[in-house]
Amino acid sequence: MSASPKGFRFATVSAGFRKEARPDLALIVSDTPATAAGVFTTNRFQAAPVVVARENLSARPVARAVVINSGQANACTGDEGMTNCRTTLDLVGKACGIPAAEVLPASTGVIGAQLHMDKWREAAPRLAAALGQNTHHDFARAIMTTDAFPKVAERELAIAGTTVRLVGMAKGAGMICPNMATMLSVVLCDAAVTPEAWQRLFLDAVDRTFNRVTVDGDTSTNDTVFGLANGASGVTVEGEDLAKLGEALTDVLARLAYMLVQDGEGATKVMRVKVSGAVDDAEAEAVARTVGHSQLVKTAMYGRDANWGRIVAAVGRSGASFKAEDVVVTLCGVELFRNGQPTDLDFDTLLREPLKGRDVTVDIELGAGTGHYELLASDLTHDYVNCNADYRS
Amino acid sequence: MSASPKGFRFATVSAGFRKEARPDLALIVSDTPATAAGVFTTNRFQAAPVVVARENLSARPVARAVVINSGQANACTGDEGMTNCRTTLDLVGKACGIPAAEVLPASTGVIGAQLHMDKWREAAPRLAAALGQNTHHDFARAIMTTDAFPKVAERELAIAGTTVRLVGMAKGAGMICPNMATMLSVVLCDAAVTPEAWQRLFLDAVDRTFNRVTVDGDTSTNDTVFGLANGASGVTVEGEDLAKLGEALTDVLARLAYMLVQDGEGATKVMRVKVSGAVDDAEAEAVARTVGHSQLVKTAMYGRDANWGRIVAAVGRSGASFKAEDVVVTLCGVELFRNGQPTDLDFDTLLREPLKGRDVTVDIELGAGTGHYELLASDLTHDYVNCNADYRS
C-alpha cells in the first residue's frame, strides 16, 4: 500500500446518523489551504450541501477541509436544510480552527429529512480530536452506504525527481435503498497547482471517467466529486508536467469509476461499450448510452447471452446516423454482426466462457466517421430488483 | 361481442414457423380495395417486411390484404430477406387473386434467420382456402408471441344514421424472448374515407396512443401499425364526421395500447405518468419519459413504494426547465411533494391500498407553462429479468 499524499489528515467517527453503529461522519483536513475544484450533479433538484459547496468554491477555489456524512442526504429540505448545512460547516470549522468558507460539505443518505443537528453538535469536537488517527481507507469506509466494499485508488508519480502522490476515495453507484444513487468522491494530491490548471485537469479527468459510467441512468440530487491539491510535496506542477499529472489523475478516477460499476447494485458484470466510426463524438456517446442503458442488453449480459439482436436494436434506435450495412458489432472479441446480418460464427460456443467473466467488451463500429466514445455499464439482475423493490405492503 | 367491420375476412393457419404447433400465419382480406395507412418503427435497422410495406403504401395508399407471420422476424436478413418477403406477397396474392402490391406484410419472431420459404409455399394456398373461417379474435391469437392474452378492441359509431364499425388487433410489448420487443397492430374500419383524411386520422391516433406507451424503452426492427378503411358499411365519412371517426379510432388504439403495457413482460402495474405545467409539450414528454423509463421508479412501483424521491430525481434529470420549488408530485391522488419538500401527509399509510392496484397514476405539475403529456409505462419486476436473462451457460 502506497502512502497517502502529504499534508492531509483524516478522521472518522460514529455520529449516529445511521441505524447501525458505524462511522458515518468523515473529515479530511489539509495542513495548508489547498487548490480545490468540484463537479456536481446536473440534477435540477440539488441537495443543500451541493449548493453550499458550489458557493464556497465559486467564491474562492481554495479549501482546507472536506466533511462528508452518510445516513442523511439533506436534499429536498428547503431553507432549513440550507441553514443546517451552513451550521455544520461552522461547527466543523470552529472545532478545527478553519474558516467555514474553506470547508466543503457532501452528504449521502435518506432524502427529505432535516439533519440531526444535535448529533452534529455532539460529534464535531470528537471529529476534530480524531484528526490524524484515521487513514484514507477509514475515510472511504465511513462514506459507504450500500457499497459492498470501500473504494480507494492510489498513484505516485515522479516530477522533477520528487514523488507526487494522489489518492482517491469514492462511494458508490450502489443506491441508497430505498432512495437513489449517490456518487461521492474526493481525490487528494500533494502537488502545488494553480487553480486554473487544477480546474482544467480535474474537469477533464472527471469527464473521461465518472461521466462515462452508468448503473441505471438515474442521477442523484447529491452527486459530488472534489479535488484538492495542497502542495505539501514541495513540488509545483506546471508547463509540460501538467499532462503527466493529468494522466495520473485520470488513472485514479478511472479506477474508482470502474469500482463504482463493479459495485453497482446487484451487478455481476462490467460492460465496456466502445463505439467508434460515428459521425462525431456526440453521436458515439448517444449510441454507447443507448446500449449501456438498454434493459434488454443489460439483462442479456446478466444472462450470458450473446444476443447481437438486442445490441443492434439499441444501436438502431439511438438516433445516430449510419448505414445499417456498415455496422460491425463485436462481443468479447467475437464478431457477431456485419453487412446487416449476423456473422456465421458459432458465437454461442465461442462466447460461452468469455461471458462468464466479470468484464465484457462490446465494440460497435458504425463506419460513418471518426467519432468515438467509451462507457462502462453494469448489467441488470435479480438482485437489482430485490434491492430496489422494497415491498412495504 | 360486437360484430366485426363489414367486408373483411380472416384466416389463420399453422405454417410451422414456431416450435409448438399453433396458428402462426394470419391473413386479412378486404372484399374491395381499402384505403390504407401505416406507421413503422423508427429504428434504423428495419426488417424486410417494414421496408416492403412502406414501399407498397407509398406507391399507392390502398390495400386488399394484410399478412402477418409470427416465429420469424425477417429482420437483419439482407437482400435475401427482401426477396423472400416479396415472394411471400406473391404467394399470398396469387392464392387469393389479389395483386401482390396490395398485400401488406408484417413479421415478428426470431431475427437474423431467413424465412422458411418451403413452409410459406405449402401454407399460402391453405391460408387462402381458410378465408372466412376465422374471426378477428383468431387473428389476434395467431399473431401472439409471448403475449399472455390476445388483444382486441371494438367500437361502433353511428354516422348519418348508419353503423360504422372499427376493430383493432395487436400483439405485444411483451418481448420475443430471446430477442426484442415487437409491437404489431392492425385496425380495420368499414367506412369510406379519402386517403388524405384517413392518413391524418390514423397518424394522429397512433401518436396519441401507441407512441405514448413504454415497457422498457426498447423499440424493435419490426414495429408496425396498419389501418384499413374499406367502405363496406356504405357510409362515407367526411367533413365534421371525421372528428367522430377520429375519436373512435383513437379510443380503439388507446385500449390496445393499454393492453400492451398491461401485458408488458413481467408487468404488474400500468403507471400513467401525467405531466402538466411544462414550458411546452416536448419538455412535458421529456419528463414523462424520464420518469416512465427510470429503473428506480419502475422498481418502486413494483415494490408498492410511495417513493417520491425517485420520482423527483427523475424529474430533475429530465432536462426540462422549471423551478424546483414549483414542482408538485401526486401519486394516486395523494400529494407527496410540494415547495421543494415532501408534504407532511402520512403517505405510506394513505397509499398502502391504492398501490396494490394495477393502475397507478403519477401526476407531475411543473408550474412553468402549459405544456402537457401523458405516458403509460409498466413496472420493472423479477419476472422481467427472468424472461430476459435466459442463461445459456
UniProtKB/Swiss-Prot annotation, chains A, B:
Single annotated GO MF: glutamate N-acetyltransferase activity
Main location: cytoplasm
Intrachain S-S bonds: none
Signal peptide: none
Site (Cleavage): A181, T182
Pathway info: Amino-acid biosynthesis; L-arginine biosynthesis; L-ornithine and N-acetyl-L-glutamate from L-glutamate and N(2)-acetyl-L-ornithine (cyclic): step 1/1; Amino-acid biosynthesis; L-arginine biosynthesis; N(2)-acetyl-L-ornithine from L-glutamate: step 1/4
Site (Involved in the stabilization of negative charge on the oxyanion by the formation of the oxyanion hole): T108, G109
Catalytic residues of the enzyme: T182 (nucleophile)
UniProt entry keywords in alphabetical sequence: Acyltransferase, Amino-acid biosynthesis, Arginine biosynthesis, Autocatalytic cleavage, Cytoplasm, Multifunctional enzyme, Transferase
EC number in record: 2.3.1.35, 2.3.1.1
Localization in the cell: Cytoplasm
GO annotation terms (biological process): L-arginine biosynthetic process; ornithine biosynthetic process
Catalytic activity: N(2)-acetyl-L-ornithine + L-glutamate = N-acetyl-L-glutamate + L-ornithine; L-glutamate + acetyl-CoA = N-acetyl-L-glutamate + CoA + H(+)
GO cellular component, one term: cytoplasm
Residues given in the record as substrate binding sites: T145, K171, T182, E265, N388, S393
One Pfam family matching this protein: ArgJ
EC top class, as a word: transferase
Highest taxon above the source species: Bacteria
Listed PANTHER family: ARGININE BIOSYNTHESIS BIFUNCTIONAL PROTEIN ARGJ, ARGININE BIOSYNTHESIS BIFUNCTIONAL PROTEIN ARGJ, MITOCHONDRIAL
Similarity remark: Belongs to the ArgJ family.
Assembly and oligomerization: Heterotetramer of two alpha and two beta chains.
Function summary: Catalyzes two activities which are involved in the cyclic version of arginine biosynthesis: the synthesis of N-acetylglutamate from glutamate and acetyl-CoA as the acetyl donor, and of ornithine by transacetylation between N(2)-acetylornithine and glutamate.
Protein name (database record): Arginine biosynthesis bifunctional protein ArgJ
Organism whose genome encodes this protein: Nitratidesulfovibrio vulgaris (strain ATCC 29579 / DSM 644 / CCUG 34227 / NCIMB 8303 / VKM B-1760 / Hildenborough) (Desulfovibrio vulgaris)
Gene: argJ
